[in-house]
Amino acid sequence: MEHIFFCTGHELKIPNIVKSKGLYLYDEQGKGYMDLESGVWCTSLGHNNAEINRIIKNQIDLLMHAGFCYSHAILEKSAKSILRIAGFNNGKSVFLCSGSEAIEISRQISKHLTEKSVSMTLHDSYLGAYSSITDKSRNWFLLDWEQCKICHDKDTCNLSCEVLQTIPKDISDFIFEPGSSSGFVRFPPKALINNIVKIVRDNGGKIVANEVTTGIGRTGKWFGYQHYDITPDFIAVGKGIGNGYPVSIALINEPTTRQLTLKPFHYAQSHQNDPLGASIVNGVIQYIEENNLISIAADNGLLLHKHLESLVDNEFITEVRGRGLMFAIDIKNEEITDSIYNNLIEKGYIVGNRGSSFRLDPPLIITKTEIEGFIEMLRESTSLFK
């Protein structure tokens, strides 16, 4: 691919994929690959999902793009669906194109309403690709929670904790990524997050749940923040909600929308509230509900976790972390990681290679048989290097 500028930092291993179906990709020789990353954690219902394809084709035949002065009824229908599953009754939503944008508009609205200047997140969060987020040299407070992982009081800590005492009072928004941690799948203690939320809220700040990766069933619940005792003001949704189509949503709770009626906010983008993206969002939610995929993902996640834990030997595989169908497998030796990764691809299995770990985010439709087949191949690949 001579004329494509690749700047993701990831090596292109299979350049000749020609078709896909469900968990599987096929190259021009007909070789199949089980995609255990769901693309870039996006195809939650599998590649080439027939029902989602039907919805896309139907909407394209009606209206796929809308201008500023006209719209389509699918917007309101889809907004009601996603606000319902979030429990944001009487809230509002903005349909956008990427998770980065859903985070960005949530930050902008927070600063607009609170008139505070500093955004806050945990030190290992990934929040998007915009420079306003990647450059955290000013107007950001990063809370380093490394010591909280091993703290004896991590499950019972209170507001007197020295780590919490460092939080400034001028926080406009605390953006919480409930588990992805830049792809390394780390779960901050519940008490820590609950205390941060209380401090920020007591000082007039907003809470943003970054559910771009962890949302839409990925963690065995609709949203990752539901594993914590918090209710956010904003929810940023992306990736899996489009099943591979670039659509995202910023959800806004009712109290915040009431504030916006008194203090209006302006934001305009070419593909904001497009009917095509909205129709896909509505279809993905409907498909998940009709096929009970949240519960199935939770159950299959427990099975996958059990099998992965059985591979931990402290020689090569040192730790497994996961929730629902989102896992990290820590490998002791990066050279061995690359060798196992290449062997898995050769055998027809795609996982995420993070150097010191593998990342698994299979589609929610993965079956127990497919899980057990992958585990057997991972066990075989690992044994080659012992």
Describe every region a protein language model picked out:
Residues 1-386:
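Conserved N-terminal phosphate-binding loop of PLP-dependent enzymes in the Aspartate aminotransferase
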